[in-house]
Curated annotation (Swiss-Prot):
Gene3D superfamilies with a match to the protein in the record: 2.60.120.970, Cystine-knot cytokines
Family: Belongs to the TGF-beta family.
Protein task: Required for posterior mesoderm formation during embryogenesis. Acts indirectly to suppress head formation by altering mesodermal patterning. Also involved in the establishment of left-right axis asymmetry, acting upstream of nodal/nr-1. Can exert long-range effects in the embryo.
Protein's organism: Xenopus tropicalis
Any one GO BP annotation for this protein: mesoderm formation
CDD domains reported in the protein's UniProt record: TGF_beta_GDF1_3_like
Glycosylation sites: 171, 202
Keyword Translocase part of the UniProt annotation: no
Keyword Signal: yes
GO molecular function, one term: protein homodimerization activity
Cystine pairs: 249-315, 278-347, 282-349
Propeptide: 17-236
Name of the protein in question: Derriere protein
Record's subunit section: Homodimer; disulfide-linked. Also forms heterodimers with other TGF-beta family members including nodal2/nr-2 and bmp4.
Length: 350
């Protein structure tokens, strides 16, 4: 199978052409059905930035250490639900809002290991008033014009809090796992009450205003794609290789700038990376430095006897390493994903 680094090398040559078969294959490997074109992208969560900047643990690339769960894909979904109309005034009720997160981007092969809801308030939040939060899972949608029934929802969280300069987080892993099946995703209902009774419209507005103008709610998921997890290989000795002639098979430097392949609009970070490539001859006899396979050694031997009927082995990657990419997907969600086989570390004859 060709490495993703090889696909990028090809894209540099065809960057001015329409979406190619090779680019479609690469996008598919990245979990995308077409090249994203963010319309109204949301902010990049600090947790995803922190994981990206920390880098991959090469000894355990399929563990999200920041969350303490297995995984190699992190997604952040923005809430798509509306503020609910209050059917009748309810004493001390500040906010009633439906929450909906579209998890259709999670593939069937992925194992969802974490679902975490974040509710973030503005930084000028009011400190003194205590509030009470109730979070329900919607089990069945009410028909238009009909009064909402409490039988159609299940209480998940009930807790009191004060507005501080920080977010509220709730573990919704079990619910998020169910939402991998779209028919089971009816969303959530969020209600926030002032703990004390509100007297008068002015006091009601003063107390509830920080709640009614919270910045956003988002859902973060961590999932594991087992097909992208590789067992770490034993480290080779670190002695440096002697200089080789320029025409001999070896690693060559290649920097991939995502702007050169037309991906700068949706790839958040990195802006580019050192992908490298393999190029050169595999002459007879193969030396240990060329890291030839047993098949390649025999092939060069046969080539030395019958050069017209048997070609020389090819110069190809023998060791590849992963990178992390932070980008917007086709639904404007922020995704952090670890990708195998993105950097050529060593070359040999195959």
């Amino acid at each position: 199978m060709l490495s993703l680094a090889c696909f990028f090398s090809f894209l540099l040559m065809v960057k001015s052409s329409p979406l190619t078969f090779q680019e479609r294959m690469l996008l598919k490997a990245l979990g995308l059905n077409t090249r994203p074109n963010p319309i109204a992208p949301g902010p990049v969560p600090k947790s995803l930035r922190d994981i990206f900047e920390k880098g991959i643990n090469k000894d355990n690339p399929c563990m999200m250490e920041g969350f303490g769960v297995p995984g190699n894909i992190v997604r952040s979904y923005r809430d798509q639900g509306p503020v609910a109309a209050m059917e009748e005034p309810q004493e001390s009720l500040c906010l009633k809002k439906f929450l909906f997160f579209d998890l259709s981007a999670v593939e069937n092969k992925e194992q969802l290991t974490l679902g975490q809801l974040e509710i973030k308030f503005k930084h000028n939040s009011y400190y003194g008033q205590q509030f009470h939060l109730r979070l329900y899972r919607t089990l069945q949608l009410s028909l238009k014009g009909m009064r909402e029934s409490k039988m159609n929802r299940k209480l998940l969280v009930s807790q009191s809090f004060r507005l501080l300069h920080k977010s509220l987080y709730f573990n919704l892993t079990k619910v998020a796992k169910d939402w991998k099946t779209p028919e089971k995703n009816m969303g959530l209902l969020l209600e926030i009450y002032a703990s004390s009774k509100l007297a008068g419209d002015n006091r009601s507005f003063a107390v509830c205003e920080p709640i009614q103008s919270f910045i956003y709610t988002s859902l973060l998921t961590v999932s594991l794609d087992p097909s992208s997890c590789k067992t770490p290989r034993a480290k080779r000795s670190t002695h440096s290789s002697p200089p080789t002639p320029s025409n001999i098979c070896k690693k060559r430097r290649l920097y991939i700038d995502f702007k050169d392949v037309g991906w700068q609009n949706w790839v958040i970070a990195p802006r580019g990376y050192m992908a490298n490539y393999c190029y050169g001859e595999c002459p007879y006899p193969l030396t240990e430095m060329l890291r030839g396979t047993n098949h390649a050694v025999l092939q060069t031997l046969v080539h030395s006897v019958e050069p017209e009927s048997t070609p020389l082995p090819c110069c190809a990657p023998t060791k590849l390493s992963p990178i992390s990419m932070l980008y917007y997907d086709n639904n404007d969600n922020v995704v952090l994903r670890h990708y195998e086989d993105m950097v050529v570390d060593e070359c040999g004859c195959k």
